[in-house]
Regions:
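Bacterial Sec-dependent N-terminal signal peptides
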Residues: 1-22
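Terminal presequence/propeptide segments associated with secretion/organelle targeting
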Residues: 17-713
Length: 713
């Protein structure tokens, strides 16, 4: 009896929403979710939930955007200004940078609308409404006898429902997403704006202060923000870039608070979290640790060492490789922290105890036992059957698909539709040719050789693609000689060579190029490996769905939130510090004093290098209306809001729906947060909006932007 009680308690902690600050909540369910509404009000919320989200009236959610499909942002002016993170705008800033105009290093400040810089591939997405379409989707799959048949039926009806939206209104995009491991389905209707221009970017000494050293760490002093503007046609509708476009006028503008926060202040985030695996089985967690996470750690570590060495040597390479290095290293360090936290916080052990209780519940309920008696044995066997190959696939993807850029170019060429409409072919070819702008062949050759060696050292020889046999037979096993020959003989190592190559009479000549031929071999091997585990993968997909549904039935009175899936979510909690380990306590905010301390502590370290004029400005202490109650300048703060990747740039609002700052990171001690919420440790790191405005007005001398903003009362 004592054991069963202990197990039940642990299970509750692992799988149910028992913490007020846990959860990424669906906006469409807010009105019906009385428990969440009650808890938010108890924590201090001072606005009704229909002011947060209402598909029929302007509301707070109307100011929140998906930024490029990979980050979040918030609209803060009647003329379409958008605040997001510096690291979210980093790729756009990099694309506009050169050695002569180094906006990464020095920042960018548009003095007028005419100086704002277009970004052809960037868009923002507004959520208009959501709709539960579960019954319609599941009805279409009711006759499916296998997981494959179910998936085909579900995918088909999801596409039909999505297309119905754009058929009625070409300016809208409909997307049906799966929730609760495929047990529920919701339609989200969006409107996209494709003309988004760069307005303001602080220097990287502000926006990336601390760089890799401080990434995922607290305390933090990173001014992680950038400013863009949405443009529309003269009717305020979506339009591709045109000089004739005008600033977009939004449905709702987020007001800004200069009052700050204190310990215990209510705080909520609205944004687009990417993905979590809170309900994943222990078998899935173990596979994640030893598969994709470990592959990222090993392979990206090798690749990034080569990139960083050359970036530190040459300014042109630093600019070319800045964005891709930043993206790669972010997930690399995340994987390191996640695996470490899973072990340190005993996530697997807790999950297994929870699963033991679920087994007991199934055994004690005849109707459940009949359906799920083999659930755990099937999951365990299926994960075991694909373990070795799945691990090899993880290393394959990191080493080749995400490895040398010559291979990535070749794969794009193989997938290029030369028979498409001429205008589309020209546009896509232009994008393909632009990739050469950020490619250095000597670096890429070194990366390719390193990837070949790394992959070979990590997998069984049965997983080696055909090129390894070629290296052995034609190049005496010398990988470097093979790589040198490949780059010397391929036509696609330069834009001119690619153009000449593609001007031939037929696309069948494509495979004559050694790089394209190699990539075709890689596709064949990748397909072969995936096919060998397709049955196990189908059984896992079904098993995880049944596992998820069983958990929800077991705790039918609980309020379960679905895993993140890049749809808009609300999370809420309070501002507050935490105790990372015994004997240490971290405060809930940082100030500019911490910048000076780190600059001194890390003297000579480029991660903490700051322009003298910025240090002089900060040391003056003249913070004006942006100062805190003590006359100092807050830089960052933390709350126990529940966030993940994709939440970067999410608006952090106070109890009245006024902007306090932007979420930009999580903390190192709780890096397993995508799998399990740790209430005592997990924190959302945000940049204080007052620091952002100070940098915009005083350092960027852009008071005209401040005048556009709507300040809270």
């Amino acid at each position: 009896m004592k054991f069963r009680l202990t197990v039940l308690i642990v299970f509750s902690l692992c799988l149910s929403n028992v913490f007020a600050d846990e959860g990424m909540w669906l906006l469409g369910n807010l009105r019906k979710n009385k428990q969440t509404d009650r808890v938010m009000k108890e924590l201090g919320l001072q606005m009704p939930v229909n002011k947060i989200y209402d598909p029929k009236k302007p509301c707070l959610a109307d100011a929140v955007v998906s930024f490029g499909g990979f980050c979040s942002g918030v609209v803060v002016s009647e003329d379409g200004l958008v605040f997001t993170n510096h690291h979210c705008g980093f790729s756009s800033i990099q694309q506009h940078s050169s050695v002569e105009h180094d906006y990464l290093k020095d920042g960018f400040f548009a003095r007028s609308l005419e100086e704002e810089l277009p970004n052809p591939e960037l868009y923002v997405r507004f959520l208009l409404r959501t709709e539960d379409v579960t019954k319609r989707v599941l009805s279409a799959a009711r006759h499916a006898k296998t997981e494959t048949e179910r998936r085909v039926a579900v995918d088909s009806i999801m596409n039909v429902i999505s297309m119905e939206v754009s058929e009625k209104d070409s300016t809208l995009t409909g997307i049906v997403d799966a929730y609760y491991a495929g047990n529920e389905f919701w339609l989200s209707v969006y409107r996209d704006y494709n003309d988004v221009r760069l307005v303001f970017a602080p220097p990287s000494s502000v926006g990336k202060f601390g760089w890799d050293t401080d990434n995922w760490m607290w305390p933090r002093q990173t001014g992680d923000f950038s400013v863009f503007r949405i443009y529309a046609n003269t009717k305020n509708g979506p339009a591709d870039y045109s000089p004739e476009n005008v600033p977009y006028h939004p449905e709702y503008v987020a007001p800004i608070s200069l009052d700050g926060y204190k310990e215990g202040s209510f705080c909520m985030t609205l944004g687009y979290p990417g993905s979590t695996e809170r309900y994943l089985s222990s078998y899935g967690i173990e596979e994640m640790m030893n598969g994709i996470n470990q592959a990222m750690i090993d392979v990206r570590g090798v690749k990034q060492t080569i990139w960083k060495r050359e970036m530190d040597r040459r300014p042109d390479i630093r600019i070319k490789y800045a964005s891709k290095y930043d993206e790669s290293s972010n997930y690399w360090k995340n994987s390191i922290g996640t695996n470490k936290a899973i072990k340190h916080l005993k996530v697997l052990e807790k999950k297994r105890v929870a699963e033991a209780e679920l087994r007991n519940w199934i055994q004690s309920h005849p109707e459940e036992r009949e359906k799920l008696i083999r659930l755990f044995s099937s999951l365990e066997l299926s994960y075991s059957n694909r373990r070795e190959t799945n691990r090899a696939l993880a290393y394959f993807g990191e080493s080749f698909i995400n490895g040398p850029e010559l291979v990535q170019l070749a794969l794009e060429i193989l997938n290029f539709d030369f028979e498409a409409e001429e205008k589309l072919v020209i546009t896509r070819m232009k994008k393909l040719l632009e990739k050469y702008d950020n490619l250095d062949l000597s670096i890429d050759k070194e990366v390719f050789a390193a990837m070949l060696k790394e992959y070979q050292s990590k997998v069984d020889k049965k997983f080696l693609p055909a090129m390894y046999e070629k290296i052995d037979t034609l190049y005496n096993g010398n990988i470097q000689t093979y790589v040198d020959s490949l780059y010397a003989t391929s036509n696609i190592t330069s834009p001119k060579g690619l153009k000449r190559f593609l001007e031939r009479d037929t696309t069948y000549n494509l495979i004559e190029d050694p790089a394209v031929s190699l990539s075709l071999d890689l596709i064949v091997k990748y397909y072969e490996m995936n096919q060998s585990i397709s049955e196990a993968s189908e059984q896992i997909e079904e098993g995880e769905r049944l596992f998820n549904a069983a958990m929800r039935r077991m705790y039918a009175d609980r309020n379960f939130y679905p895993d993140a899936n890049s749809t808009m979510r609300l999370s809420f909690g309070t501002v507050g510090g935490y105790t990372p380990f015994d004997g240490a306590t971290y405060d809930y905010y940082t100030t500019v004093k911490g910048i000076f301390e780190k600059v001194k502590e890390h003297a000579g370290d480029i991660d903490f290098a700051v322009q003298p004029e910025l240090l002089s400005l900060l040391s003056s202490g003249d913070f004006g209306r942006y100062a805190n109650a003590q006359g100092d300048m807050n830089v960052c703060f933390i709350s126990n809001n529940d966030i993940t990747g994709g939440n970067s740039g999410s608006a952090m609002f106070n109890a009245k729906g006024e902007l306090l700052g932007l979420a930009f990171d999580g903390n190192w001690e709780a890096m397993s947060s995508d799998i399990v919420f740790e209430p005592d440790l997990q924190r959302c790191i945000g940049v204080d909006v007052r620091y952002m405005l100070f940098i915009i007005e005083k350092y960027g001398k852009s008071a005209h932007l401040i005048q556009e903003l709507k300040m809270g009362r």
